[in-house]
Amino acid sequence: MPKHHQKAQSPGGSQRQLRVGEIVRHAVAELLSQGGVHDPVLEGHLITVPEVRMSPDLKLATVYVMPLGGRDTDVVLKALAANKPFIRTAVARRVNLKFAPDLRFRIDERFDEAERIEKLLRTPGVQKDLQQDSDET
């Protein structure tokens, strides 16, 4: 009897998850950028949508967002959560899927993490270590 091997998946999921996530990301970003959600908080912020991660069954989409400038993240998350039913319906109309995915909104903290690493790399102690490493090679 042959053994079934699971395919190794990339950190973001299968090709299908990545493809559907990108389609959902585009739909949400377009909706937010064109003022499709009539909410004063959301209309007052430019919101980027750098990534959407889909569950393996494609029924759950984790939407990573970041208000431009990184301000008012809690307020923006609350406004997105309050408008989730409308956003989900609007995305379902734009995306041809068997099920409209449930949306979870999260703040994308990669920018903050990258900035923290940049600051760390510029500290005198790290600069000294990097200089010593380059002198040895």
From Swiss-Prot:
Pfam families from the xrefs? RBFA (PF02033)
What disulfide bonds does the UniProt entry report for this chain?
Answer: none
Keyword Cytoplasm found: yes
Q: Which PROSITE patterns match?
A: RBFA
Where is it localised? Cytoplasm
A GO-annotated cellular component:
cytosol
Molecular function in Gene Ontology: ribosomal small subunit binding
Predominant cellular place of this UniProt entry's protein: cytoplasm
Q: Give the superkingdom in one word.
A: Bacteria
| GO biological process: one example | maturation of SSU-rRNA
Keywords on this record?
Answer: Cytoplasm, Ribosome biogenesis
Function in brief: One of several proteins that assist in the late maturation steps of the functional core of the 30S ribosomal subunit. Associates with free 30S ribosomal subunits (but not with 30S subunits that are part of 70S ribosomes or polysomes). Required for efficient processing of 16S rRNA. May interact with the 5'-terminal helix region of 16S rRNA.
Quaternary state and interactors: Monomer. Binds 30S ribosomal subunits, but not 50S ribosomal subunits or 70S ribosomes.
Q: What is this protein called?
A: Ribosome-binding factor A
Q: Which gene encodes it?
A: rbfA
